From Swiss-Prot:
Record-listed Phosphoserine modification sites: S100
Described purpose of this protein according to its UniProt entry: Catalyzes the conversion of glucosamine-6-phosphate to glucosamine-1-phosphate.
Keywords, in A-Z order: Isomerase, Magnesium, Metal-binding, Phosphoprotein
Enzyme class, broadest EC rank: isomerase
Protein name: Phosphoglucosamine mutase
GO CC annotations on file: cytosol
Protein family membership: Belongs to the phosphohexose mutase family.
Active-site annotation: S100 (phosphoserine intermediate)
Disulfides per UniProt: none
Names of required cofactors: Mg(2+)
One record GO biological process: carbohydrate metabolic process
Length: 445
């Protein structure tokens, strides 16, 4: 990763860190690198519902067209839908304007290659170098060689049809509350679940440009937990701002996280003989309970760094097709090239229908060890992470767990945060440990 590109593209406060001028340059550089040798020089652009999306889209489109590349606009669309549409429309690349689960002030730009996969570090570095060099060497075509813009009117229909084709079950009889996070899935998610026969109660599906992720979605599932109980629904589904993740809620209003969803789906695939290489890829944030549950079934667990790009790398390296994160970023490579919250939900719903078991019972396949996570906002992540004082404190606190837990302190790849996670048998002890480490981080910063 370079200066601009983090674990999930370029992110920052819109109109400050991520200005229209920067978006224009990223568009020019991205078009030159990704589409210059393409016989079909067009790029798909989608976005979430943030107020800054129109501004950044206009700048990005101008940059791409100024490099002689056409633009296919798909409007408000989930990130994984853009990955799919890039392949479906045979474009040279796809671009998403979104900051996922981040607050409305932020926005971001991330690319997909022609195959629908996120870019490698090397390709991102090439784009970044061009931007830093003011796009030197990128041509300025004139006349008929300037890029054109076309609105893809049936983009949502194409994705809904594709998503439904991955399920293979009738969802009739299921009542589902769907939290759309006032984000990119506010239209397509309810359509998909309804089309397959479910009774859908959508909430947080009225975006106004500033309410994305505001007290809703997968990072704030409390309202969904209440709604599932009050609606007497079978379960709830919570997407985030760009719908590349999903968490679930059982009929009793209890949260079912990405680890539990992965255990449910992995065991189902394993029993059907469909779990490629009998392997699941997870990150260091996954609960120890996941490891125990999968190993009990004879399933190999491969662990990697936080970030769905790293999960994808390990999937490809290990010949595996399924993996994800506790946060609900889950990849089914048999269906899509990136984490897809709607497709993940459909796989979970398929297991519920096929087994006839409620989500509560299925989630009980995994016993979660107590885990505590706290985010600390810092000015200098590198200063904190390189501090010998912090390293000594972590080592000291780990000794207190006596081998029956772990501590993980890591910087966020997309926000000015350091995340402190402790896992063990006693929540009271974990609170004390995390509290002490948080105080040390604040003192260092």
């Amino acid at each position: 990763m370079g200066v601009m590109f983090g674990t999930d593209g370029v992110r920052g406060v819109a109109n400050r860190d991520l200005s229209p001028l920067l978006a224009f340059k990223i568009g020019r550089a991205g078009a030159h690198v990704l589409a210059r040798q393409s016989p079909n020089a067009a790029m798909v652009i989608g976005r979430d519902t943030r107020i800054s999306g129109d501004m950044l889209e206009a700048a990005l489109v101008a940059g791409i067209c100024s490099a002689g590349v056409d633009v296919l606009k798909v409007g408000v669309m989930p990130t994984p839908a853009v990955a799919y549409l890039t392949r479906k429309l045979e474009a040279a690349a796809g671009v998403v304007i979104s900051a996922s689960h981040n607050p409305v002030d932020d926005n971001g730009i991330k690319f997909f290659g022609a195959t629908g996969y996120k870019l490698s570090d090397e390709v991102e570095a090439e784009i970044e170098a061009l931007v830093m060099d003011e796009c030197a060497g990128v041509p300025w075509p004139t006349g008929g060689r300037v890029g054109r813009v076309r609105q893809v009117g049936d983009a949502a229909d194409l994705y809904v049809k594709f998503a439904c084709s991955t399920a293979g079950v009738d969802l009739s009889g299921l009542k589902i509350v769907v939290d759309c996070a006032n984000g990119a899935a506010y239209q397509v998610a309810p359509r998909v679940y309804s089309r397959l026969g479910a009774e859908v109660v959508p909430i947080f599906n009225r975006p106004d440009g500033i309410n994305i992720n505001d007290g809703c979605g997968s990072t704030h599932p409390e309202a969904l937990m209440e709604a599932v109980v009050s609606e007497k629904a079978d379960l709830g589904l919570a997407h985030d701002g760009d719908a590349d993740r999903v968490l679930a809620v059982d009929a009793d209003g209890r949260l079912v996280d990405g680890d539990q969803i992965m255990v449910i789906c992995a065991r189902s695939l394993h029993e059907k003989g469909l779990l490629a290489n009998e392997t699941v890829v997870v990150t260091v944030m996954s609960n120890l309970g996941l490891h125990l549950a999968l190993r009990e079934s004879g399933i190999r667990v491969v662990q990697t760094k936080v970030g769905d790009r790293y999960v994808l790398e390990e999937l490809l390296r290990n010949g595996a097709r399924f993996g994800g994160e506790q946060s609900g970023h889950i990849i089914f490579l048999d269906h899509n090239t990136t984490g897809d919250g709607i497709l993940t939900a459909l796989q979970l719903l398929s297991v519920i229908k096929e087994t006839g078991k409620p989500l509560k019972e299925l989630a009980g396949q995994m016993e979660r060890l107590p885990q505590l996570l706290e985010n600390v906002r810092v000015a200098d992540k590198a200063l904190v992470m390189n501090s010998p004082v912090l390293a000594e404190a972590i080592e000291r606190e780990e000794r207190l767990l006596e081998g029956m837990g772990r501590i993980l302190v890591r910087p966020s790849g997309t926000e000015p945060l350091v995340r402190v996670m402790a896992e063990g048998k006693n929540m009271g002890q974990l609170k004390e440990i995390v509290g002490r480490l948080v105080n040390i981080i604040k003192e260092i910063d």
